Amino acid sequence: MALEIDFTDRVVLVTGGVRGVGAGISRAFLAAGATVIACARRPAEVAVEKAGRAIEFESCDVRDADAVGVLVEKVLARHGRIDHLVNNAGGAPFALAAEASKNFHAKIVELNLLAPLLVAQAVNAVMQRQAEGGSIVNISSVSGQRPSPGTAAYGAAKAGLDSLTSTLAVEWAPKVRVNSLVGGSVDTELSRLHFGDQSGVDAVGKTIPLGRLATPDDIGNCAAFLASPLAEYVSGATLLVHGGGERPAFLAASTADVSQ
């Protein structure tokens, strides 16, 4: 029997699901037949569509408990269930740890750690009442697993998100599976602002064993796998989607011509 991912008749909520990585996640679920509700603070400039189908957009600040409650109630009123949640909303601007304010650090942690917990709590309450339960995928980052200069609070928050994932997987089992998808560098508009032109993107790609940055669709496909029945025995896991990580610097030296 062929292995297939089919989300027909399934309802998926994707936070931050209208741009960049989030749009890639939304497209993956649309391609697999899901009804996708994508929330963000503002709608996308470009329609998020796949296989002739489009997302349903809802405006929501995921840091606001009341707004999250309204969002969940809207989804339930329209569809009667929530089968999968992908916590993708997050991010951080560059700021050195010694120079950023207390308020700046607090806001970064709020968006990247506390907000995913807030949304997960609201959706878990729904999933626990459903006969088939549900699954949650938290989008994390390699910044939480190695030094993250310039985004210290972000890296700390993502490390916390990975820890949170493993805890929720225990607390909310067996009805709800919870997993973390740890992304590496992804080729988006924001990454190009950070890395510069194509030559800058290519230079970063050369530091990755697979030779390129991830695409939003790479992340989306892996998120869909974690949410799917193919991963029905996977919970509390951390899936690294980083192209092999970062090539150690000594490997470049090891290719030098030492024959002379």
Residue ranges and their predicted role:
Residues 2-3, 146, 235-260:
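Short C-terminal tail/terminal secondary-structure segment
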Residues 18-19:
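Conserved glycine-rich cofactor-binding loop
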Residues 96-109, 204:
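Substrate-binding pocket helix/loop in short-chain dehydrogenase/reductase
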Residues 117, 212-241, 246:
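C-terminal substrate-recognition "lid" of short-chain dehydrogenase/reductases
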Residues 120, 157:
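Active-site helix of classical SDR
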Residues 125, 169-174, 232:
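Alpha-helical segment proximal to the catalytic Tyr-Lys
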Residues 141:
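Residue(s) in the substrate-gating loop at a strand-loop-helix junction
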